[in-house]
Amino acid sequence: MKKKTLMIHGGITGDEKTGAVSVPIYQVSTYKQPKAGQHTGYEYSRTANPTRTALEALVTELESGEAGYAFSSGMAAITAVMMLFNSGDHVVLTDDVYGGTYRVMTKVLNRLGIESTFVDTSSREEVEKAIRPNTKAIYIETPTNPLLKITDLTLMADIAKKAGVLLIVDNTFNTPYFQQPLTLGADIVLHSATKYLGGHSDVVGGLVVTASKELGEELHFVQNSTGGVLGPQDSWLLMRGIKTLGLRMEAIDQNARKIASFLENHPAVQTLYYPGSSNHPGHELAKTQGAGFGGMISFDIGSEERVDAFLGNLKLFTIAESLGAVESLISVPARMTHASIPRERRLELGITDGLIRISVGIEDAEDLLEDIGQALENI
């Protein structure tokens, strides 16, 4: 089944009892039992809910996995995955990882004894050097947030397998429409479903899919024990969003290519970060590893003052956290998504005060280009 078809017909669809074409929203907390201690598949909605189950079945198919679970946010999903590990365990992570991931690893999970090392995962040498006897996982974003570096997932899967550790991939930026990490050897794939999967800036959620049922059972135990589950209303919204994911990603990808080409040739832009550019060091890998380049673009215009002037001139782009929506969003990583990372560390990574991140939407590309052009001309 082709991806666009699977997004509509995959998983659990409709309701056999009523003939409803859409999955119902089961706004319920508990379920009648025929006898004490016996249930018919559901007992309490923290453990399972029919609407959430339908979403989980869908995303499991989309990621070609064996088990899937829906969480109350992307960070709840990431934290639950990290709770698979014990005090004294070590995780190797992408260096310019999302600020929330950096924060939970260095400010929360470290207090539980889970150690972390951040390296450039696009470098085989750095990853292999970072692995210790107590390393349990390699955690990757590809493309990374916000510098859009590309990591070779097949290579990382080989390194992880030889080291006897898990490979965890945050697939938020590319989505299963463009990239399927489990088919390339990953053990766990996760999403901030708030972003492209939802796609409309109206739901917060996280999704995790595992390559094995056994790993899925371990994760479900953590989820049920800690309680960070997604509610039925939000589960339904995500299923609705996923139906148009293919259409949206194609439109976003085409818009991003045009905008990146414009920015790459604009004198006000000092550095462009976009894997679709032939000048990007990961361009060839991005072409073979995924079916598209996605809708994220970062570029540096030199200073905080120039950034503020540029943002003040924009008319269509909304200054906001998050990404992956139908509307184009723009942010300043140093002051927004990555503000939790110490300034010295940000500068080491290249996350400067002049760096801007765009999440391209599905508006007409000509309107977006005109808006960016006039905003740059007047700084």
Swiss-Prot record:
<keyword id="KW-0663">Pyridoxal phosphate</keyword>
<dbReference type="GO" id="GO:0004123">
    <property type="term" value="F:cystathionine gamma-lyase activity"/>
</dbReference>
<dbReference type="GO" id="GO:0019343">
    <property type="term" value="P:cysteine biosynthetic process via cystathionine"/>
</dbReference>
<dbReference type="GO" id="GO:0019346">
    <property type="term" value="P:transsulfuration"/>
</dbReference>
<dbReference type="GO" id="GO:0043418">
    <property type="term" value="P:homocysteine catabolic process"/>
</dbReference>
<dbReference type="Pfam" id="PF01053">
    <property type="entry name" value="Cys_Met_Meta_PP"/>
</dbReference>
<dbReference type="GO" id="GO:0003962">
    <property type="term" value="F:cystathionine gamma-synthase activity"/>
</dbReference>
<protein>
    <recommendedName>
        <fullName>Cystathionine gamma-lyase</fullName>
        <ecNumber>4.4.1.1</ecNumber>
        <ecNumber>4.4.1.2</ecNumber>
    </recommendedName>
</protein>
<comment type="function">
    <text>Catalyzes the conversion of cystathionine to cysteine, and homocysteine to sulfide.</text>
</comment>
<dbReference type="GO" id="GO:0008284">
    <property type="term" value="P:positive regulation of cell population proliferation"/>
</dbReference>
<comment type="similarity">
    <text>Belongs to the trans-sulfuration enzymes family.</text>
</comment>
<dbReference type="InterPro" id="IPR015424">
    <property type="entry name" value="PyrdxlP-dep_Trfase"/>
</dbReference>
<dbReference type="GO" id="GO:0047982">
    <property type="term" value="F:homocysteine desulfhydrase activity"/>
</dbReference>
<feature type="modified residue" description="N6-(pyridoxal phosphate)lysine">
    <location>
        <position position="195"/>
    </location>
</feature>
<dbReference type="GO" id="GO:0030170">
    <property type="term" value="F:pyridoxal phosphate binding"/>
</dbReference>
<dbReference type="GO" id="GO:0005737">
    <property type="term" value="C:cytoplasm"/>
</dbReference>
<dbReference type="InterPro" id="IPR015421">
    <property type="entry name" value="PyrdxlP-dep_Trfase_major"/>
</dbReference>
<dbReference type="InterPro" id="IPR000277">
    <property type="entry name" value="Cys/Met-Metab_PyrdxlP-dep_enz"/>
</dbReference>
<keyword id="KW-0456">Lyase</keyword>
<dbReference type="InterPro" id="IPR054542">
    <property type="entry name" value="Cys_met_metab_PP"/>
</dbReference>
<dbReference type="InterPro" id="IPR015422">
    <property type="entry name" value="PyrdxlP-dep_Trfase_small"/>
</dbReference>
